[in-house]
Amino acid sequence: MKIGKVPENVLKRSVLRQIKTKRKEVISGAGVGEDCAIFSFTDNMPLFTCMQEAVLWPDGDTAERGSSWDSPAITPGQLIQKCANNLAAGGGRMIAAMITLLLPEETEETYIKAFMSEAEAKCTELKVQIAGGQTRISNAVRMPVASVTGYGVPFEKNGEPRAGRSAVGQQTVNKCGIGKPRLGQDVVISKWIGLEGTAILAKKNREKLLDRYPAYLVDEAACFERFLSVIPEAATAVKSGVCAMHDASEGGVFGALWELAEGAGVGLTIDLKKLPLRQETVEICECCNVNPYELLSGGCLVMTTEDGPGLVAALESEGIPAVIVGKVTDSNDRIIVNEDEVRYMDRPKQDEIYRISAERQ
């Protein structure tokens, strides 16, 4: 199989169809496009949980680098952020994390300390407690593997965690812990697509890009990681009555749109020209022969709502760029409109980051 998430048909056939045991306490569980699971054990606050894992590819000697991480796809802080983003897309704010590290035999203690130092720095920023985990050395792995399990509580209507049963929690039988996309709803996207992948490309191809573009463009793109949190827009969206949310990440915006629609059994009509792109992403993707619509898009939140203009206005009032890009339809067709051209959206493919990495090997 190709590197990255398994194809959707494999996920459905060999993973989801094998899950047969159901419990009433699990009010939102495994499924296509689900960002997190939600549990309800009592009439009090429901518990949100999700898991993120990554193979870490440190560059050079960890002892010399200290906590300076350089990975083609992820850092310890980004791993924590991705977990928090998934919970936010489900309607919850992360409050605790469990971290598991599986490390090769040659790992030095300085490596572990550097990982935990950066992870703790991100958790401090997010007001998240590292509540436990496991650190194990194994000769079964060649590269460090990290797994983060995040735990969260529902956003309150003021954007803060709620201290009791919430309307959000009561709706979690539907998609994304908020609700199912419904016919006629507006599809809204926050910030810009391809941010995460653009930052990686800018760092990994700096010399090549500098032969073509000014340094300020490449440097700005490399700093796009500052946009990766979707917690602010998710909190604002909950206050504004959003119906469904999905965190765009691996597979790009096309993958996120497909998963949101597939999980709810609805169709979409999306205007390609309205999908928000930074000029840095356009230029760098052209130079690197990458499709920006299928590129890592962490930092971009896909939402559906009855009142698209109202949600956009609410987000923009908080300084968060947002735009209406399409509509939810009553068919299973996911259509991309580009002026006079109409085509059907493909099932999610291997993310462009993994594709170009494989081609260069």
Locations of regions flagged by a protein language model:
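Short, acidic (Asp/Glu-rich) active-site segment that either coordinates a divalent metal cofactor
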Residues: 173-234
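Short, ordered loop/turn segments at secondary-structure junctions
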Residues: 99-102, 134-136, 192-193, 249-251, ...
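Solvent-exposed alpha-helices and their adjacent loops that cap or buttress functional pockets
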Residues: 29-31, 39-43, 123, 138-143, ...
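Acidic, Ser/Thr/Pro-rich beta/coil linker or hinge segments at domain junctions
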Residues: 2-3, 7, 11, 316-361
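Active-site-proximal betaalpha loop/short-helix elements
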Residues: 104-106, 221-297
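Helix N-cap motif at beta-to-alpha junctions
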Residues: 304-310
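Beta-strand->loop->alpha-helix junctions that form or flank phosphate-binding loops
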Residues: 28-31, 248-249, 267-276, 293-296, ...
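Glycine-rich phosphate/pyrophosphate-binding loop regions near the starts of catalytic domains
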Residues: 5-189, 194-195
